[in-house]
């Protein structure tokens, strides 16, 4: 909408003159920032990490380690296996920490419906990565509406069944995100359909209380064995969202210089690591390491990132990945 209404400046010339670190950070991906073949303008620097390899994943569904332990750490690969583990655990442990056990909880009263209702339906029913409300058939080079795809009806039938059975949180459609996080922090929600960045603070709270078994394992759950989990699928740089400069900006040169500093080694280290001697140090091999104190505090203090600034303002700015 901003581009269609001519609200953003084309940063191409400014980057050519003032953005060497921007070009260095994006490298071979730089040309992918251009809007289209018809309009090669660069309206935004994407918020996706550049050269990011998937090393760890929260899977398509999550399950408490306590439930996995109860099942001899057997991994559920299908919805039926996943549901049965939760069902059996709820029967055996109807309460956790003196509160009613919740089988699966999601929060759909605000934008989180997208990450907990829409996205999992594509992951689990179709083995499709997050492409918005669309499924991309790379072989046929076709795009079609996700919720009309094969498997979607069966996925929502499953949600309906576990709701009627009492496994799905009855407040899933009306509870606030804060309510949802509080339930997770109580340690009584067995399964999630979410991403770890969303419930991370609740896990920090659980660990600080010595309830590591109530944190979550990311699992490759799909609707049946014919569907392949998409969580480890490598994808190209996502350029659909990011940070741009509006035409009302009084000093676009200064704005680009700031973005260029963000992309510099100095800026990237400060945003991601903090201050040398306080949050990190260099070992005898010249490798940057987080201090033991910060490592321990980051595991138990839900305000660590906000308090120290480490990792707090990485998004929505450009950032190096882990490659």
Residue ranges of predicted features:
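Extracytoplasmic/secretory soluble proteins
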Residues: 1-323
